[in-house]
Amino acid sequence: MTMKIYTKRGDQGKTSLRHGERVAKDDIRIETNGQIDELNALLGIVVALMPADNPERERLHNLQLLLMKIMGMIADSSNVLPSEDKSFSSMIVDLEHYIDENTSKDRFCFVVPGGSLLAAQLQFARTKARTCERRMWTLRRDYTLDDEVMSLMNRLSDYLFILALCVQ
């Protein structure tokens, strides 16, 4: 028997969180996860556009995995990282190192997105990362969300900005 992708349970404007709770489709948790999902798809486009030998492909893929972890945390309300999970703090340090290594004084300016399709997609992903971060701060008013998760989202947009400049 084939499993169907549709259930019809969402036809009335409700959807389920991972633990089964039914919520409105515009619930802040659903909205936030939708924004993060869009960012993840944009990062997938960026990775697909990058040359196969670009070392940033692996970092971007690892960021995609962390975004999926964040979505899971939001969907099941386990919004605090286990103390042994160092993946977020490690990635924050990694992003900060990349940003520091690739930032020069002449790069601090407003940038018109473009130059190449890859650079433009990176700038688009950067703007989506900022949208995600804003939705996550809204979510955090009513739900717990780990400080390291919030820090990662803040660094992510900076990283994408610098990466876009580097590939331009």
Predicted regions and their residues:
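Phosphate/pyrophosphate-binding loop motifs in nucleotide- or prenyl diphosphate-using proteins
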Residues: 1-168
